[in-house]
Amino acid sequence: MGLLDIILGRTKPVAPDLDRLFALPSAAVTLEAAVSLTPTGTGAVCFATVEGAAFDDVRREVRALLDADAARTGPPVGIERDEYGYSWLVSRRGPRDLPALVSDLHAVNSALESDGFGPQLLCSVVGFRGEDEGEGGAGGRLGLVYLYKRGTFYPFAPLPGGGRRRDSALELRVRAALADDLRIEPELDRWFPIWGAPGL
């Protein structure tokens, strides 16, 4: 950044730091203790769909790499497209196998980034679920979203019932609980709703 950037109030964009994803397992322990949320075992990487053989090759390689994991149980890695035209590469692991799920997400992001598709990466999300509301737990679902281009996390908690409403109170409680574990996105207007994301 130069002097002119400082005078005009411009800021330098934060470089993505994919290693921040590895803080999720310890953050999950905090979430369970603070707001009774546990991992669902589902995580996904969202990217803008690109047409072309090069991108298809990378996508196939990443999928084959993750499916080759001998320890993987359950369904293979899948690719879903949402109503907005974005693609989600979805990995499913056991609910207590969060470190392996995080490694999957890191591998997908790293592969796309190293092959020149970093600008297409949007976010990664790991799903969590709460206990029944009647027992004093959080209830419902929550996604911890990693914004690739900002290098930050934020919580997204859609309310059950099919409407497009979010549980803002739960999101703020999660932000407070994880302040020491994750780099939380400070600008609330960047806490984009990811309606229909896999695992939520």
Give the label of every model feature segment.
Residues 15-20, 59-62, 96-98:
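N-terminal start-of-chain detector that recognizes signal peptides
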Residues 18, 116-200:
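Terminal interaction module
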Residues 2-3, 14-20, 25-27, 39-45, ...:
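Generic structural motif recognizing short loop/turn segments at the entrances and edges of beta-strands
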Residues 33-88, 94:
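A glycine-rich, hydrophobic loop/mini-helix early in the fold
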Residues 22-27, 66-69, 101-105:
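A short linear-motif detector with a strong N-terminal bias
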Residues 1-55, 166-200:
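Charge-rich, low-complexity segments
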Residues 72-130:
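Core of folded catalytic or high-affinity ligand/protein-binding domains
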Residues 11, 66-70, 112:
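Conserved NTP-handling cores and scaffolds of large molecular machines
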